[in-house]
């Protein structure tokens, strides 16, 4: 991937791409605030959480097939461009607190693509968040998908039921119709991730019950 093609318009990118870019812009906003308030430790934790929880364990894992071989379709191009943007931005965000690794990551990226003429991440402009890229509703929905998936997988491990063994149903407690609507919007994603045939909603219960 050399990033020679024009950017795929945001409106034409899949929801999962728009989500990670929304979270990325939220991260830029929060990390910039941390640095301005002399809170480098907090900034580092935010960057670490983004890379581990959102980028690696969720975005990359859910999109493995898009990155694999096959024709270079717009969908695949969108995935590559989105991931590249995340990595390049993370390199810039972490540069003040992890100067050597950030510089290596940034140098590797721009060497492959030639997208920047500067020779070091420390000479590049610090990222600026784009408010129009932030979709809080989408972030909330995806966070719920992550939370439910994490709990169900933890329950599977607890009772020693492997993910490849399908479950008939999980019952998810919801506190109101808004929460139910958010989870309903990502229900198929949850079902695929935990290998379950049906999601049912229950009122007032605590935790997630596996049936």
Give residue spans per PLM region.
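Feature 926 captures the class I aminoacyl-tRNA synthetase adenylation module centered on the KMSKS loop
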Residues: 1-211
């Amino acid at each position: 991937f050399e990033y020679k093609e024009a950017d795929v318009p945001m409106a034409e990118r899949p929801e999962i791409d728009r989500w990670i870019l929304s979270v990325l812009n939220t991260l830029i906003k929060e990390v910039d605030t941390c640095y301005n308030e002399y809170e480098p430790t907090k900034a580092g934790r935010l960057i670490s959480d983004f890379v581990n929880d959102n980028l690696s364990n969720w975005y990359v894992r859910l999109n493995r097939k898009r990155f694999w071989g096959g024709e270079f379709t717009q969908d695949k191009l969108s995935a590559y461009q989105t991931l590249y943007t995340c990595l390049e931005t993370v390199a810039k965000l972490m540069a003040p607190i992890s100067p050597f690794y950030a510089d290596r990551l940034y140098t590797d990226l721009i060497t492959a693509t030639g997208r920047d003429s500067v020779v070091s991440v420390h000479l590049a402009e610090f990222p600026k968040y784009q408010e129009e890229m932030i979709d809080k509703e989408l972030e909330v929905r995806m966070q719920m998908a992550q939370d439910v998936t994490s709990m169900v997988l933890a329950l599977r491990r607890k009772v020693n039921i492997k993910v490849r063994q399908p479950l008939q149903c999980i019952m998810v407690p919801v506190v109101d119709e808004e929460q139910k609507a958010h989870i309903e919007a990502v229900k198929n994603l949850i079902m695929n991730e935990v290998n379950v045939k049906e999601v049912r909603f229950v009122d007032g219960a605590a935790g997630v019950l596996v049936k």
